[in-house]
């Protein structure tokens, strides 16, 4: 609910202040203590089952068998246990494909060709979409006879979502497969029906791996008559091990967050620690990335306090003072600065220092200066946006707003906040990101455009009218409906750029490339489902939080 604007002591007008919903998880995780015996039992069982799965990988001989097993491991959230074995199998498959000139490695059915194409691209190997030409009729359309192959059509649909901009064949594959899946989803039997419905809402390539793993284990695989009981048992034990690990991390982070007591000191700001942590598991869910998850929580909480201070409370004059404090990175010369700004600034600096200590422990001290620079960069961008919103500067062109949005998408600060937790990150990685590569910009703008689509009406009702949608409508004289349609098209094109950029990033370790891909996935999954972000709206995230962190899987 928006409040009326008020005049403050510096003579400026405050923005309409949004009263956010309270935190629904305040005490849920803070007192959690992990049962080391239970966790140890899960770990022992996982290790024993892993040996049997390695034997399965070795025993799989045909390309089809190998691809299905790799895909199943990835859907179940187990592939991180077998990274070396999977990469070796994929290299063998690619060699076979190059000999056969067929993405199925000689198993010439639509399902296997599509599966091979998608998995190979998702692992950053080159493969041409020409492998699908054999399924086209004389007019260049997909043969209608394929529509009776439900699993094949679904596999084609999933493959179409790793396409690049210039791949019109895959554009047609997406249209063709979606049309037929929509027509059959209501008559399919469970669990295939649920699998198709999930794909239509969240194509697998755009889904968040750990979210999908929970869905696949609970709703698909354990109901599949052809399931492998060994894989199912490993998947359930692995998920419960991860769930306990996440609760332990949340307990530690809750204590870290609560010590600042910003809920009472800065009541205008969002109190969303658990929602921030969900982004952490979305970025990298594997156990070895604990510092990635912790770093992202620190980064997101910094972003939220800064965003809500600029966007939801500060006057233009106060925001300028706030920005200058970040530029100086010092409490010196802040006499006359309102207390709430001192509190907000002190939190940001303290949180940064916690990050800096973590970076030192990990031997990644070089990451801290860039993280600091992204905080200062974000302050300048938020300050500029507030001047536009409050009318102290004329409304920007769509191009000027979009350029500022590259920063307020938070792709740079969020990436910087986790770099110390990636073993492969070096100073060269940071230098690469400083050059604003198209791959990073494209992932950031997916999030920014989805946010603008979802927030246009909400922010307009709150008394503000500065979104990319609003700028586009004004500059080009189009309706909101037309602007939103254009933005959705732009998101689709950006995904094609992300796919191409991801596949081309072979000079950088895959864990870094996946980081940016997962940012886009988190944004896409949030906004396509709800037209709002899962951080601000606690009800939207409640179901995901319960499933990932609280509800046990049924064995």
Curated annotation (Swiss-Prot):
Top-rank taxon, per record: Eukaryota
Pathway field: Secondary metabolite biosynthesis; terpenoid biosynthesis
Residues that coordinate or bind (2E,6E)-farnesyl diphosphate: 270, 307, 311, 448, 451
Catalysed reactions listed for this entry: (2E,6E)-farnesyl diphosphate + H2O = tau-cadinol + diphosphate; (2E,6E)-farnesyl diphosphate = (+)-gamma-cadinene + diphosphate
Residues that coordinate or bind Mg(2+) 1: 307, 311
Binding site for Mg(2+) 3: 451, 455, 459
GO terms, molecular function: magnesium ion binding; sesquiterpene synthase activity
PANTHER family per UniProt: OS04G0344100 PROTEIN-RELATED, SESQUITERPENE SYNTHASE 31
Free-text comment on this protein's domains from its UniProt entry: The Asp-Asp-Xaa-Xaa-Asp/Glu (DDXXD/E) motif is important for the catalytic activity, presumably through binding to Mg(2+).
Entry protein name: Tau-cadinol synthase
Originating organism: Lavandula angustifolia
């Amino acid at each position: 609910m928006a409040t009326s604007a008020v005049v403050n002591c510096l003579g400026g007008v405050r923005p309409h202040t949004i009263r956010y919903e309270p935190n629904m998880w305040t005490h849920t995780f803070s007192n959690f203590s992990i049962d080391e015996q239970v966790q140890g039992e899960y770990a022992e069982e996982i290790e024993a089952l892993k040996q049997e799965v390695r034997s399965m990988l070795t025993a799989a001989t045909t390309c089809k068998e190998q691809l299905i097993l790799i895909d199943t491991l990835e859907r179940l959230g187990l592939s991180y246990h077998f990274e070396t074995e999977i990469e070796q199998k994929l290299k063998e498959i690619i060699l076979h494909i190059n000999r056969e000139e067929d993405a199925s490695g000689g198993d010439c059915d639509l399902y296997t060709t599509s599966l091979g194409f998608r998995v190979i691209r998702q692992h950053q190997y080159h493969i041409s979409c020409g492998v699908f030409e054999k399924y086209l009729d004389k007019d260049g359309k997909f043969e209608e006879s394929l529509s009776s192959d439900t699993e094949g059509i679904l596999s084609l649909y999933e493959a179409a979502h790793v396409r690049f901009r210039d791949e019109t064949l895959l554009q047609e594959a997406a249209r063709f497969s979606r049309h037929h899946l929509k027509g059959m989803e209501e008559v399919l039997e469970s669990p295939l029906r649920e699998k198709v419905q999930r794909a239509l809402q969240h194509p697998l390539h755009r889904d968040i791996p750990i979210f999908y793993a929970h869905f696949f284990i609970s709703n698909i695989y354990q109901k599949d008559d052809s399931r492998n009981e060994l894989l199912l048992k490993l998947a359930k034990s692995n998920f419960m091990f991860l769930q306990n690990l996440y609760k332990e991390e949340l307990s530690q982070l809750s204590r870290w967050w609560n010590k600042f007591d910003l809920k009472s000191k800065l009541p205008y700001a969002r109190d969303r620690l658990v929602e921030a942590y969900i982004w952490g598991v979305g970025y990298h869910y594997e156990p070895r990335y604990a510092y990635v998850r912790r770093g992202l929580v620190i980064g997101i909480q910094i972003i939220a306090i800064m965003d809500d201070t600029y966007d939801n409370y500060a006057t233009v004059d106060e925001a300028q003072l706030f920005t200058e404090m970040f530029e100086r990175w010092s409490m010196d010369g802040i006499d006359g600065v309102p207390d709430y700004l001192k509190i907000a600034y002190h939190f940001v600096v303290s949180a940064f220092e916690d990050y800096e200590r973590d970076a030192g422990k990990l031997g990644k001290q070089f990451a801290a200066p860039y993280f600091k620079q992204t905080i200062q960069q974000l302050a300048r961008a938020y300050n500029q946006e507030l001047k536009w919103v409050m009318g102290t500067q004329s409304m920007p062109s769509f191009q000027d707003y979009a350029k500022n949005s590259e920063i307020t998408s938070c792709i740079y600060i969020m990436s910087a906040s986790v770099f110390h937790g990636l073993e492969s990150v070096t100073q060269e990685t940071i230098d690469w990101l400083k050059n604003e590569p198209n791959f990073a910009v494209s992932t950031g703008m997916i999030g920014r455009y989805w946010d603008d689509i979802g927030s246009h009406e909400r922010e307009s009702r709150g008394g503000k009218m500065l979104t990319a949608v609003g700028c586009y409508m004004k500059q080009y004289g189009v309706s909101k409906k037309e602007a939103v349609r254009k933005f959705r098209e732009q998101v689709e094109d950006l995904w094609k750029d992300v796919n191409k950029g991801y596949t081309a990033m072979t000079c950088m370790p895959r864990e870094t490339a996946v980081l940016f891909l997962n940012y886009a996935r988190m944004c896409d999954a949030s906004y396509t489902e709800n037209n709002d972000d899962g951080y601000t709206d606690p009800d939207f995230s409640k179901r995901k939080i319960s499933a990932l962190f609280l509800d046990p899987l049924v064995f």
